[in-house]
């Protein structure tokens, strides 16, 4: 149940709502789909970041595609062995609104953490240019519709594989593997 709408607008890419609710606290909603909230964001961000960073033997260079709320970046810069985190999000408005309405999530961006570089741009195009560079790539994106659709394509996964170092790890928010079997197959086919 929403108690207050703090922001309702439209960026170049999507509809954006920031609202308060009794159950989840402040929430970010993109194109009508819940993305994150103050009260439970840690479960998602800690899982998508810490698991691959603890599994990799030496994760120095991390790339985050998406992640405009800043939560994945906040968690990645906490690892002492990580030297650099590059975050590329297509929607600069989500980044700015997150800094304003979700300062505890976007802490690393707000504090200009020296390990973090934030780029507003197309993550698909960015990935095409990288080769054998990243130890860990995290794709923290919305569902496979709208601006996130291309992040679930076979070509994107091929480019991701090329951008990883030989021992690199890749993690992506992919919805349920039972509901999206083709997506899981495309990932493993790369």
Residue ranges and their predicted role:
Residues 1-27:
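N-terminal auxiliary segments of SAM/dcSAM-dependent transferases
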Residues 36-187:
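The AdoMet/dcAdoMet-binding core of the Class I SAM-like
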